[in-house]
Design a protein with these regions (language model features):
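Generic enzyme active-site microenvironment
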Residues: 86, 192-194, 230-232, 285
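Short, glycine/acidic-enriched loop or turn micro-motifs at the edges of active sites
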Residues: 91, 197-198, 233-235, 290
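Short, flexible loop segments at the rims of nucleotide/cofactor-binding pockets, characterized by
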Residues: 64-65, 205-209, 233-237
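Divalent metal-binding pocket/active-site signature
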Residues: 157-171, 202
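Short secondary-structure boundary segments
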Residues: 91, 162, 261, 287-288
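Glycoside hydrolase catalytic-domain groove-lining segments
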Residues: 237-287
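Active-site-proximal segments of metal-dependent phosphoesterases and phosphodiesterases across multiple
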Residues: 200-214
Length: 312
């Protein structure tokens, strides 16, 4: 072999070895961080417009100078600010429900290459725990309307408000939910419900006051009523119930979960770890609060986004 060929061969071998070593190191690093790129992780994040509730235009305060965000601009804003292409909206943020408005919303979503993932229904006077028959019928009727709106908007799910689920209303809640989900299935829309604490007396509650149902009661209602769980990582009274509840609820989802960031209250990485153990492959929808994440909603969402990218 000529000296030039020997040197060239040695250089090629050294380059191949170096590239292989770097690729192996990258593979090991990815394995240590869950094996996903940042783009793949961002594809599993969504942002709740509830995070911007204090600055969304309208909501009965048309002249409030602090309300600067037009909800039609939210999909593009979320894409531009955070690189996230999934949006979860409050039903109260829609400024109309007619066909032209929905066409405009769909166009804005399409332009941002974004997907409306869930509409959260927070009706003022009715929920699944409503006791009076006329209230239950109104809950069913309003929910059906928004299920139809989901179809028009290409949204796969609604989030229903379960109310307190105290022992005296659980059976009625099951029946009301079943009537809603029976209709939703014909429209191919999922009906989700999130956990909202409960399981123990509320602070300063009077003696013998009914206890709000915890995650166990919610699961019972979901199973009887044909709904799906929307695990909310933050909404548990303690670590023991969080660990137990998430293991059950992540196995009952339609693909959406609410994720906060409050390290002084609980271990977010541990909670996400439970989702991984159960095999959850759905979305983590960012939910912020001024108490946990500061008064600036844009910075608050950024902080939760950055924290989640490190652990999902």
């Amino acid at each position: 072999m000529k000296r030039r060929e020997f040197i060239a061969g040695g250089l090629a071998g050294g380059v191949a070895f170096a590239l292989g070593t770097r690729a192996q190191a990258r593979g090991q690093a990815q394995a240590q961080t869950g094996g996903a790129s940042e783009a793949e992780k961002l594809a599993r994040l969504s942002v709740m417009t509830y995070c911007f509730d204090r600055i969304v235009k309208g909501l009965g305060k048309p002249d409030d100078p602090d309300r600067t965000l037009d909800i039609l601009d939210a999909p593009q804003m979320i894409t531009d600010h955070y690189g996230i292409h999934h949006v979860e909206m409050q039903h109260t943020h829609f400024q109309a429900t007619d066909k032209p408005y929905f066409q405009e919303m769909k166009g804005r979503l399409r332009k941002a290459n974004s997907q409306l993932t869930q509409i959260c229904l927070e009706f003022d006077f009715v929920d699944l725990s409503s006791k009076q028959k006329y209230q239950q019928l109104e809950m069913i009727a309003l929910s059906k309307d928004w299920i139809d709106y989901c179809v028009q908007l290409g949204c796969p799910r609604v989030l229903l408000n379960q109310g307190p689920l105290t022992p005296d209303v659980v059976e009625d809640a099951k029946s009301t939910l079943k009537q809603i989900t029976d209709y939703a299935k014909t429209q191919k829309v999922f009906c989700d419900i999130e956990n909202r604490g409960g399981g123990r007396p509320a602070p300063n509650a009077p003696p013998n006051a009914p206890v709000r149902g915890g995650w166990e009661v919610l699961v019972e209602v979901l199973k009887a009523g044909g709904g799906y769980a929307n695990p909310d990582i933050g909404n548990f009274p303690d670590e023991e119930s969080r660990a137990a509840g998430l293991r059950v609820m992540y196995a009952m989802t339609s693909g959406n979960s609410h994720a906060h960031y409050a390290p002084d209250r609980y271990d977010e990485a541990k909670a996400i770890g439970i989702a991984k153990e159960v095999g959850y492959k759905g979305l983590f929808s960012i939910e912020t609060s001024a108490r946990n994440n500061g008064p600036d909603p844009y910075a608050a969402v950024q902080s939760v986004r950055d924290a989640l990218l490190k652990i999902i």
